Structure formats: C-alpha cells, structure tokens
Amino acid sequence: MTEKLKQGIDQLGLKVAETIQQSMLAFLAFLQKWNQAYNLTAITEIKSMITHHLLDSLSILPYLKGDKILDVGSGAGFPGIPLAFACPEKKFTLIDSKAKKTAFLLQAASRFKITNVTIIQERVGSYQPGFYFDTITCRALGSVREIMEQTNHLLRSGGQWLIMKGTYPEKELRGTDASAIVHVLNVPGLKAERHLVEVKNNKG
C-alpha cells in the first residue's frame, strides 16, 4: 500500500514526505476501524481508499491558495485531512453537521497530532467564525450554486471556491459566476471522471 500511495503522489506531480505518507496510511487504517461501527464511508478497503479518498483529495492540492482553508461537509475528512497533512503551514477548518463524523475527525486529529485543523459540528449556513477564509473546498455535497450560496458569507473577497465533482457539471454551471473555471482531475488509478470547479469570489 505504501508503494501504491507513493506512485500515485508521484504521478500527480506532488512532493509529500514519506513520513507524511505513512501518517496518511495510518489515518486510513483508523478510518477503516471506525467505519465498522459508524459507517463513515462506503469505501471499505484500504487499496480503494488510497485511490478514491487520498489521491482524489490530493489532486486539488496545486489549486489551493491562501492560509485559511474551510472544508465544507468534510464527512470522514476528505479532502480536508489529506490536504492538512500535506500542508502543515496552512490552517484548515473542517465542518460537518453530523456528530458521528465530527467525533471521528476530533479523534483522528488528536491521535495523529494534526495540529493545523479545527473541527466544527454545525450547519455551514449558521457558522460565524468571525473571520473570512481564503479557500473553501467541498466534495460531493450539493450543487455548485447551493454551495456558493451557503458559504458566501465565509469567503473573503478575492478568495476562491474549489468544488469537486464527478462528470462535467454542465447544468450546474448555468447561471453561476462567469469566472468559473473547470479543471479535469486525473486521479491515478481512478477510472471515473473527476472535475474541479474553481470560482473566484468577486464580491466587493
């Protein structure tokens, strides 16, 4: 499994220390254990988790900007946890409304000493941190328009949304911000289509 992750990271053109890669794999094992009781993810095998969770999350790393990142609907921690592992200099806030998921994330952050993450259990529309984020990430949660509307109060002017999607979200992009750019994500070992919708916040 170590080699599978290493090769995938190399194919993505990223540089992640081997110690960090080992921590990522340990996190997956921890998730697998919790998943038996709490059903946090439909993907149960470590091999598939590497592709569908770790490498998929890391594929958006080159597009990450700023130091304050909000991961919305973080669930079992994707993409937030892998990105936090890979970018210890950035501050990540992972928000989810479900208690069992934030309980897992709190335990994982403590166990693996991920000191650059803050875990919040709350609906994102009600979240008021008292500051703005530079980037808001989201995977598999609502339409592009819905995500932007629910989180607009949290993103600084000039900041960006990075919204992960499967197939090209043509219908979702109709009527959204004209500044939207769609990137094709080539995730090593993943046959399914993956796209990243990047939208800049142009509010004054």
Curated annotation (Swiss-Prot):
GO cellular component, as recorded: cytosol
A Pfam family found in this protein is: GidB
Where is it mainly found?
Answer: cytoplasm
The membrane spanning regions, by residue number, are: none
Q: What is its EC number?
A: 2.1.1.170
Please state what the protein is called: Ribosomal RNA small subunit methyltransferase G
Q: Where does S-adenosyl-L-methionine bind?
A: G73, F78, R139
Q: Which InterPro entries match?
A: rRNA_ssu_MeTfrase_G, SAM-dependent_MTases_sf
Provide the family line: Belongs to the methyltransferase superfamily. RNA methyltransferase RsmG family.
- A Gene Ontology molecular-function term? rRNA (guanine-N7-)-methyltransferase activity
Q: Which gene encodes it?
A: rsmG
The record's keywords, sorted A to Z, are:
Cytoplasm, Methyltransferase, rRNA processing, S-adenosyl-L-methionine, Transferase
Say what the protein does. Answer: Specifically methylates the N7 position of guanine in position 527 of 16S rRNA.
Reactions catalysed, as given in the entry:
guanosine(527) in 16S rRNA + S-adenosyl-L-methionine = N(7)-methylguanosine(527) in 16S rRNA + S-adenosyl-L-homocysteine
According to its UniProt record, where is this protein located? Cytoplasm
NCBIfam families assigned: rsmG_gidB
